[in-house]
A protein has these predicted regions:
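Active-site/acyl-donor-binding loops of N-acyltransferases
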Residues: 4-40, 104-238
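Short secondary-structure boundary micro-motifs
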Residues: 76-80, 144
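Intrinsically disordered, low-complexity segments enriched in polar/charged residues with Gly/Pro
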Residues: 79-82, 223
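A short helix-loop-beta-strand connector motif used in the catalytic cores of GNAT acetyltransferases and
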Residues: 81-93, 207-211
Length: 238
């Protein structure tokens, strides 16, 4: 059960119900308020059917050390893309370098299933909003959500990259950010384990990072070890 870090009431309730907090996950969110320059070194296009095998190999290799990850086959990954509402292969992108796929990720519009908003805006966000309100008079600034305002965002899903080429993933993130702006979204976000190398790449785009706690309850035996932990973004919504 993921619980937002500031939600003390829920954490207290689940603690009383016998659940234990065993892991943190982070949700970095890039504010898509201005377009990024992209590198001509890479070819970035939607994935095509004949590339699925290579994409699956990259995803499986990238996530091989993460608990909770189940490797894909080409067939199960195609089914996965089709079965998640408002996802699909047309929203899955691959980065090619010298005809080799070196990074990939999908964009999922989960807003068709659920909306995110602050029922009570954190104090830090209120402070940032005041500061950015002044700065907005002289330059473009990231949008800060108001209390009760629905967040317009896209989830980054099923990402992976050749760890020898993190700049390929950065190029893809910039491309997805530009697409998000064209689609009039305010944020591009995902959910990751703190040890995920993807987080280090995403930090180069200066995201807002929030923390969620994973609470679990064992009905038999010891609590599971979730270190490092594969985060399926569908679990944050569905």
């Amino acid at each position: 059960m993921p619980i937002y870090e500031s939600n003390r009431a829920s954490k207290s309730l689940f603690g009383k119900l016998g659940y234990s907090r065993i892991r943190e996950i982070k949700t970095p969110a890039i504010s898509t308020y201005k377009k990024s320059d992209t590198s001509p070194e890479y070819s970035i296009k939607p994935v095509i059917k004949k590339e699925i095998v290579d994409v699956v190999g990259l995803i499986n290799e990238y996530n091989s050390g993460f608990i909770h990850f189940l490797p894909f086959t080409a067939q199960t990954f195609e089914t996965h893309l089709k079965s998640v509402p408002w996802y699909g292969s047309e929203n899955f992108w691959a980065v090619r370098n010298e005809n080799k796929i070196v990074a990939c990720a999908g964009l999922w519009d989960s807003s068709k299933l659920a909306n995110l908003y602050y029922a009570r805006e954190p104090a830090a966000m209120k402070m940032m909003k005041s500061i950015f309100g002044v700065l907005s008079l002289i330059t473009k600034v990231p949008k800060i959500m108001a209390e009760g305002e629905r967040l317009k965002f896209l989830y980054i899903a099923d990402y992976a990259f050749d760890k020898r080429q993190p700049e390929a993933m950065l190029a893809l993130l910039k491309h997805l950010s530009n697409l998000s702006i064209d689609m009039k979204q305010d944020y591009l976000m995902t959910a990751t384990d703190p040890e995920d190398d993807f987080l280090a790449v995403m930090k180069k785009l200066k995201p807002q990072i929030e923390i969620w706690s994973i609470f679990v309850k064992s009905f038999e035996g010891d609590l599971p070890t979730l270190n490092p932990f594969y985060v399926d973004v569908r679990d944050m919504i569905l």
